[in-house]
Amino acid sequence: RKESSAASDVYKRQTFVKIMILYTRQEDTKKMKIVDEYFGCDVFSTSAMQRYLPHAVYKQMMDVMEKGKELPKEIADVVANAMKDWAMDKGATHYTHWFQPMTGITAEKHDAFINPTGPTSVISDFRGKELIKGEPDASSFPSGGLRATFEARGYTAWDPTSLAFVKEKTLYIPTLFCSYDGSALDKKTPLLRSNDALNKAAVRLLNIMGYNIHKIKTTVGPEQEYFLIDEDMFKERLDLLVTGRTLFGAAPVKGQELDDHYFGSLSERVKAYMEEVDEELWKLGVYAKTEHKEVAPCQFELAPVFTSTNIANDQNQLTMEVLQKVASHHGLVCLLHEKPFDGVNGSGKHNNWSFCTEEGENILEPGDSPKDNIRFLTVLAAIIKGVDEYQDLLRISVASAGNDHRLGADEAPPAIISIYLGEELTAILEAIEAGNEYVDTIDRKLELGVSTLPPIAKDSTDRNRTSPFAFTGNKFEFRMLGSNLNISCPNTILNTIVAEELTQFADELECVKQEDMTKALIALIQKTLKNHKRIIFSGNGYSDEWKKEAQKRGLLELKTTADALPHYTDPKNLQLFEKHNVYSASELHARESILLTNYYQVVQIEAKTMAYMLRKQILPAIFSYEAKLAQIIQTKKSSGIEAVSYTHLRAHET
């Protein structure tokens, strides 16, 4: 009866969801919003600033946001008041300093705009000091020993380069989080420091090379994978509720064997969910662009258009939050765990990274003739060198207990770091190293054999899905990230590594005359390739042969998080981060401690959950089934029916 009642409840819920989807579709058809008209409507954007700020203050704010100038204290009150007026016009009653502590997820504390003016009266107020600084309890967040209960003071500091927004009647102000002594206690502060380090190093090198460049910025487009499952089914699984993944279970009769889920047609329920997700993200200024079914059943992906790394990081945090919150509106649960189900693919987050000039010119764009693009080839050589020298840091940047289940499991890149460049770039670099002239032999037209179709232009590189760090036309795609990872750490490390190599190149080229620059650059590229070409690999990263070859080349294979994390504070890594003012020694040691603690706590929680389920759910079910079988056997015996053992039956098989 209980099972029948539960099934009836599920049927009623599903019917209700279908009716609501149809109703929502009809209502949406009536109002048919145009995205252009409401995109970013909940963001305190530059157009909103123009409307709410005096012109002189607006210009100063643009200098802060675009040129990195310090915010004058005298305009802080004006900006805060304008921000409050805009937010209240959007229905906001509270504000919060929105930050990203070392938990990897966002944190917020909501304060109302009201201030008392009498026994029963208030005034809405928001001042510059409240905008610029907040004070949460730093000891209540992971700090790796940087803070304790008896020294708990911490500060949040407004980040004016990431736009404030309104969500659920609250003004969200993106902020940094630091301790009383200025130590970074969050994910965002080191990311901004690494952006500064890369900007400084890249501008210096490019100007030495003869390019008049004043500023560069890194850009990222993170592709977000996730699973959707029915909410009622989710609630039946204690392991999913507690750990985000299944700890027990049987393989389904049909998984992903037929390759028929990838890019498949979307159900009405999922389509309605995606439409609501898109609308919520577009209101928040997130460039949600592409969505589709992924390889595993019930797995999907959402990919945005790239934007500056700091904003991309904030927007990815918003994306994960919206994906999970909107799911409940449709009777669904969004799973962001890296490996929620055994036997099918897990979920990752491809990090598409590049950097460009202040005019928007992509430094990693090879152009029509990559072999003649000496700027691109120089930067490419620096990246190759950096990835080879700091394999351990790139592996550490994606290390987690959940991601260990994905990496190297024939669904995600292996734990061995390598670079894939594609046929053309690999051939160009081989020719440069050998001192030969590169001859282009690649056929760039694809003939489909259909008379009505013209030839299709073919990319110069194929797509190697097994490579952890692949060049994909005008960017590098770092594919090792787990689906729920905060992208700040991988990008902080990547920025710092590249900043170091560009600095070394600049040191070597600083005294070279301009007329000798091309010759010096080619010699530098040749030397770099001779020393670091071992990191370049174009084959199948899933194969056992590659593991053997990688060992011969001397590449690291840090299979698990426990193998990788102790390398975080190796002397060369400490020196790297301190040199570029990204982490101090204490900040780096703290992060190593936090990650190790998180690793064993996650594993411990999973073990406790398994033991509880075994004792309270699985063993009682087994004992109950055994009792039923024993009762059946006893009933048959009392009826004169002889029980035949399984072993006896097998003995008669031929």
Show which residues each predicted segment covers:
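C-terminal substrate/ligand-recognition segments
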Residues: 604-625
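Generic long, charged, amphipathic alpha-helical segments
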Residues: 635-649
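Gly-rich Lys/Arg/Thr-decorated short loops/hinges at beta-loop-alpha junctions or inter-strand turns
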Residues: 35-45, 254-262
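Glycine-rich, acidic/polar active-site loops that bind/position phosphate-bearing ligands
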Residues: 151-336, 345-348, 354-593
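Single conserved hydrophobic/aromatic residue that forms the stacking wall/gate
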Residues: 1-11, 648
